[in-house]
């Protein structure tokens, strides 16, 4: 009988990546097949996030639901991973004694051994250590699920912003070697992946070891990824302004595979608040980066993160944030009201901004960025955009859907063989959350580089001489 695994994931793209690796790992070692139905599962895993408000209570609320399933099936294994697990550790079992496994983001590769241990003597396992980059050496080969893929290139963060738990839950920065990253991406390209999104809590701080023992920069890595046949789009997230060096900007000038869209968090437009946040850059320095980026890539669009109502934020501080939003003309944002994360320096600051004032500021900020986003979308009307076709449209099974470089969803009429390929689409309609268009060019007319397996290259290029001896003809 097939054993089943259910994973519930909260939080960032790194958590999504980690969850996919958990599924691949447990399929390879134990034959577990994923199920969307928790009631069917033999193992339940909760991959948690501690960024949002009341993250801990959200975890225990979910565990309370799963407790009922365990009462019906005592052999059910329940595991909690991610950043809340890293923060809370064994405290989770003190409140939820029925949890069998507690693991951190850096120990997910040990899940097979943890499950074996629980199956063997029914004793709980807690492992929230930080064994640096070990987890990547223990994971199975990547499996593509569609034309886009996430690839983690580093873990952790050294910046210690006063509001952020990441350095405490994921550890300090550790970069994967460049060869490991490139090999993973080449494997994905051979399976049909056309777009990769390089992941890291502070991704542009990557400093990985090269094959010859030297240390590569993030700019070096971007160019190497762009050279892989079949990879025609590169994204990365999340960046820090202090690490956004001029050599990265030069990659935007000479590497078309790097998309004309960048998510670069700023958090506030007021230098006083940035200082309280421990951001180590000013609003002027941030704008200087954007100015240089737009000199290298004039059509680039920028998204960002904002925290409103940070302790000590005045009306004047908020007005400076709104001025920065107008000056940069952000395309979109992830914006939130400040809520203290336990164990961070900001949790000890006096939260002196009234809740209603926080809500009003958030509303004003989001309305402004929504207006700017719509203005950007309207500029696309009548233009031809290159779309990576991801699958059937959510709006209609008779249509296809894909994304532009600037992350807009586009719905259009097409044929099934277009899925996983690029098409050029003329934008005919603009809506709040999507665009509509018509296909004007297919991939066959674009001259793109397509990844091939070694076997297909040999089959295509192998020739035989007059006596039947094979030889290679490139």
From Swiss-Prot:
[4Fe-4S] cluster 2 binds at residues 157, 161, 164. The keyword Plastid does not apply. [4Fe-4S] cluster 1 binds at residues 12, 49, 83. Residues 378-441 form the TRAM domain. PROSITE patterns: MTTASE_N, MTTASE_RADICAL, RADICAL_SAM, TRAM. It catalyses: N(6)-dimethylallyladenosine(37) in tRNA + (sulfur carrier)-SH + AH2 + 2 S-adenosyl-L-methionine = 2-methylsulfanyl-N(6)-dimethylallyladenosine(37) in tRNA + (sulfur carrier)-H + 5'-deoxyadenosine + L-methionine + A + S-adenosyl-L-homocysteine + 2 H(+). Monomer. This is tRNA-2-methylthio-N(6)-dimethylallyladenosine synthase. The gene is miaB.
